[in-house]
Amino acid sequence: MLRCHTVEHVARVRSIAEPTWLDADTPVSETSFEAALLAAGAAIAAAESGGFALARPPGHHALADRAMGFCLFDNVAVAARHAQAELGLARIAILDWDVHHGNGTEAIFWDDPTVLFVSLHQWPFYPGSGGPGTGNETTVNVPLDALSGDDDYRRVFTGVVEPVIHAFAPELLLVSAGFDAHEADPLADMRVTDDGFRWMAQRASTLAPRVAAVLEGGYNVATLPRLVQAALEGFAK
C-alpha cells in the first residue's frame, strides 16, 4: 500500500471509528479500512494470476494522499507496484475504460516512465480532468463525447489504444474495468452495449503477455453482473 499512498493517508483511513464522509462522494465506516485492504489484495491476486478482481470499494480516483470519488486506495496502482516489486515485471500498462477519468491512477504514475496509463472516458465529466491535450509520454487520455457508443469506442481502441500499448510493449496489462459507460448506467451518458464491453475485453486480452482486470465503476446493479460476465467472456477468448 505504501508504494502508492502516504503513511498519513493510510493511517487516516485506518483510524475511522464511525460512519463519516471523507469527501462529498466517499462515505466510510469503521469497516471501510478492512474492505479497502481486501480490495487492494484482490487486485494483487488478479495481477499474479491473470484474473478479474471483483473489488469494492473501487480505486482509480484515490490520490496518494487522500480518498476521492468512492475510492479509498488505488487498487490497480497497488497491483502495478506489486507486480514490479514482487513479480519482477518492469513495464506495466494500465487501461482504464471506466466512464470517469482515472485521475488518481494518472497522478500516481505521472512521472514514472515504466508505467503507461491510458484512459477512455466521458468528457467533460467528473472529476474534471483528462481533457483534450492532457497527458505526457506515458499518460494518454482519450476524452469522448457524451452519447458515445460501441462504434466510437472501437474507433479509438483500434486507432489509439492498441497502437500506444503495442509501442510501449508492457509485460503486464492491468485493466481498470468500469462498466458505467453502459447504455443503462444511471450515472453517465454513454451508450456502450454488452457486446461493446465483450469486444474491448477480447481486444485487451491480446495486448500483453499477461492481462488482469480490476472492477471500477458500474452503478446499475441489475446489469452489472451481466456486464462483468460479458467482459470475462471477452478476456477468455
PLM regions and their residue ranges:
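HDAC/HDAC-like amidohydrolase catalytic core signature
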Residues: 1-237
